[in-house]
């Protein structure tokens, strides 16, 4: 049955207007985004089938175009729209963390770093550069590949810190395996960087490990 034939209170758009987006399911939100379904399938049916196919919203948003187009009714237009919406969400989080905002929320920091790092199929080492009031100056992805003491260069990190005139820094990198548990190498890298940055009077506030649905803070573990 077309959504237009549903009771008005059950239609996703009308529900959103009446009750707000937080009251809708992921299927209903995706249906609004898709706008239309396919022959014999409403946009809600298409949204439900898509989420079930990928096993959740996160793998759907991380899917490649080739994976996305395997679903009947999904093609280039919907893929590019979804990628644009995902990027807008990342930039929204970045705007919330701009220089005018003090970095006082660990959850916002986790959310921001997860949005930027969790989708990479390889390891990426990044940093949030902060001023002396812990306001965000910049976010940079510094190193890619296997993250160990041979690939993370303290001299380059110090150079970037001095460029931004940062007073403090938060490191982060992802574990493509999805398991966010810090390794011995992660701890060693953190300590090496702490020693290097201490020479230029810059504090390392944290090193966060981004997994699949989880972000582990070394500071909260008492390792910084």
From Swiss-Prot:
Record-given protein name: UPF0758 protein HCH_01020
SUPFAM superfamilies the record matches: JAB1/MPN domain, RuvA domain 2-like
Gene3D superfamilies tied to this protein: Cytidine Deaminase, domain 2 (3.40.140.10)
Family label: Belongs to the UPF0758 family.
Xref: InterPro entries: MPN (IPR037518), RadC_JAB (IPR025657), RuvA_2-like (IPR010994), UPF0758 (IPR001405), UPF0758_CS (IPR020891), UPF0758_N (IPR046778)
Keyword Metal-binding tagged: yes
GO biological process: proteolysis
PROSITE patterns in UniProt: MPN (PS50249), UPF0758 (PS01302)
Lineage: Bacteria, Pseudomonadati, Pseudomonadota, Gammaproteobacteria, Oceanospirillales
Residue ranges annotated as motif JAMM motif: 173-186
Domain called MPN: residue spans: 102-224
Binding residues for Zn(2+): 173, 175, 186
Keywords: Hydrolase, Metal-binding, Metalloprotease, Protease, Zinc
An annotated Gene Ontology molecular function: metal ion binding
